């Protein structure tokens, strides 16, 4: 990531006629290192691969410096049966969507970054990079997408609580804060996690019943 310094730029700040180059990293690359790969094996096989602790710290440094602008998930829900093929046959990639926010908010709770950083990397900055109309901010005329989270109580990641069809998470066993309590799309609650639902939570609407396709305008 170091060689990208002074090359990447947020589209909203781009000037001149040069190329707009944006970058992203994943919660997995900001969390795991070679010791996790040694323990978890092909569960953590992905491309680019999980590397060493000093590489992870380089990503953090360049993320906070603005060279890397966004947090993505690279969600690739391969089955455990496929992952059990071992090296090199197991496919690269892993589930990542449903733990992404809690992982990053846990990093914020632990002092690696601020809450405002997470909002920028996962909401406003992403909307900027992709010119998403009405997304990334709470403001008049926007789409009204909101997530309410619990920053006080930690819960472990359990495979049996995942929503992905493949039923596992690379973060299994990790204690995370920042779990979503309510998700609102276009002003409509679509998911909740309460004592009655248990930690897995429940969906409140049918898939596709709320929200519209994301509109992205050209950069220039």
What kind of feature is each model-predicted range?
Residues 49, 116-117, 158-163:
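Short, positively charged
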Residues 43, 70-71, 76-153:
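His/Asp/Glu-enriched, well-ordered alpha-helical/loop segment
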Residues 30, 80, 156:
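Conserved protein kinase catalytic core
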Residues 1-71:
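Histidine/acidic residue-rich metal-binding segments in metalloenzymes
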Residues 25-26, 75, 151, 174:
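Fold-independent oxyanion-binding glycine-rich loops
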């Amino acid at each position: 990531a170091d060689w990208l310094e002074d090359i990447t730029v947020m589209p909203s700040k781009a000037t001149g006629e040069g190329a707009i180059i944006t970058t992203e990293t994943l919660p997995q690359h900001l969390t795991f290192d070679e010791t996790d790969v040694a323990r978890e094996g092909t569960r953590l096989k992905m491309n680019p691969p999980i590397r060493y602790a000093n590489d992870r710290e380089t990503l953090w440094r360049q993320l906070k410096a603005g060279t890397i602008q966004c947090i993505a998930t690279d969600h690739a829900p391969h089955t455990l049966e496929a992952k059990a093929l071992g090296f090199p046959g197991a496919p690269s990639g892993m589930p990542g969507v449903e733990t992404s926010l809690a992982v990053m908010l846990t990093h914020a709770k632990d002092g690696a970054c601020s809450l405002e950083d997470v909002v920028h990397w996962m909401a406003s900055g992403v909307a900027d990079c992709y010119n998403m109309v009405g997304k990334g901010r709470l403001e008049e005329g926007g789409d009204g997408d909101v997530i309410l989270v619990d920053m006080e109580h930690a819960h472990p990641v359990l495979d049996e609580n995942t929503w992905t069809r493949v039923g596992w998470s690379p973060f299994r066993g990790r204690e995370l804060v920042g779990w979503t309590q309510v998700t609102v799309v276009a002003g409509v609650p679509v998911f909740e996690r309460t004592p009655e639902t248990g930690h897995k939570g429940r969906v409140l609407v049918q898939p596709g019943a709320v929200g519209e396709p994301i509109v992205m305008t050209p950069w220039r």
